[in-house]
Amino acid sequence: MRPVTAQWVANAVSGTLAADVDAIVTSVVKDSREVAPGALYVAFVGERVDGHDFVPAALAAGATLCLVSQHVDAPHVLVDDVELALGALARAYLALLRTEGDITVVAVTGSNGKTTTKDLLAQTLPDVVAPVGSYNNEIGMPLTVLAADSSTRHLVLEMGASGPGHIAYLTSIAPPDVAIVLMVGTAHAGGYDGPDGIARAKAELVRGLVPGGVAILNADDTAVAAMAPLAERVVTFGQASVADVRASDLTLAKGRASFVPVVRGASGHRMTLSLVGEHHVTNALAALAAALECGMQLDEASALIAQAKPVSAHRMAVTERADGITIIDDSYNASPESMRAAFLALLDVAEGGRTVAVIGEMLEMGDASREAHWELGHHAVRLGIDYLLVVGEGAKPAFDAAVREGSWGDEAAFVGSIGDARSYLSERLMAGDTVLVKASHGTGLYELADELVRTQA
């Protein structure tokens, strides 16, 4: 973070300062355990924890200033709403960086693929700041903005939403120069009034562009392509022949895609992705289009994207265990679209070996939940996945559908808990198996994935 004074912070958030006006702030954190000397500690009040209780610990660790919503015995800025104040601070700070240097804001949204595309750009663009993990909400995104400094040329932001207006708020903090919309799917469907509502929410990113900014849109997704009139400049990507940035001569080997990038008719060198899953071709093309808009050359950008590794945890992480069992950990999140993509990746990685899909509930599906899980069970059987293990009552319709579709005997199984899933797998897995673990993060199924990765039977 570029150093700022306590007075500057107070002015930015329209708060009341009770501290040395010239005290210097050099970082912003919301966890007292992450405080370093010079930090601004942001005291959030949560359902179970009140951040104000940790102000003494923050001071002991060297915090210069605290952002609070109640009086504390420490140098502080007092505000009515800490979350809104954090957004205001990030908004003012980005404006300051823009006046002092050349910084390009690249924002990514979409029902699936946001974090992967962000991670690809973080490993491709020079002088870049991007979050690790999925820091894409009203708290995480401002903290990412505040991690940039005067040397930052590219600020990559992930903008998520679970309802209308969320992305519009995030773009009010950090209006993007480059806006990437990956897809309109059914993730968080419970927060919207149907597919059109989801599309309108994702379009908020395009509406939030700076004047003259460019929208990078998926030509393969009709709802995304329809956002083109909202932007002054548009670059498209995808498999469609009309896309500005597309993939030619696509092949797959053990789940990893290889293709020739074509940009407005000009072919680059073949690139083979390190990421597992054909669906990552879309993410790679989006990242490539953004990198080109940021001034990179085709072959340089494509080479860096090809060699990029998974950074954020529990996202298509493939581990080949010493006992001959391969684990695909994609347990961070789940939607119908990402589940289907993960099933295909499972089959590709297995290359004819025995396949085991361990799936949990897709959360935040609202009234569509039962039907979505039912369709998932049908899909698993139709694809020819050998064994389907469904974990948790919320996902049980997937098991019921698999049985109805013809998954007999022990080809499909239902267990009520992660502990039961652990026992089931320990009795059945053998060398040569490829196991996919996937569910929404809130199910906790990632704990099982971690155990499977650590186990070297």
Predicted regions and their residues:
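Short, basic phosphate-binding NTP loop
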Residues: 1-107, 117-122, 146, 270, ...
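Residue-level signal for inorganic ion chemistry
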Residues: 9, 39, 58, 89, ...
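Active-site beta-alpha connecting loops in nucleotide-dependent enzymes
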Residues: 47-49, 312-314, 331-407
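Non-catalytic positions within long, well-ordered alpha-helices that form the structural scaffold/packing
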Residues: 55, 59-60, 171-172, 381
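Acidic, Mg2+-coordinating active-site environments of NTP-dependent enzymes
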Residues: 69-73, 101, 178-326, 378-381, ...
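Phosphate-binding loop of NTP-binding sites
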Residues: 85-219, 225-232, 427, 451-456
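ATP-dependent carboxylate/acyl-activation modules
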Residues: 108, 114, 313-316, 339, ...
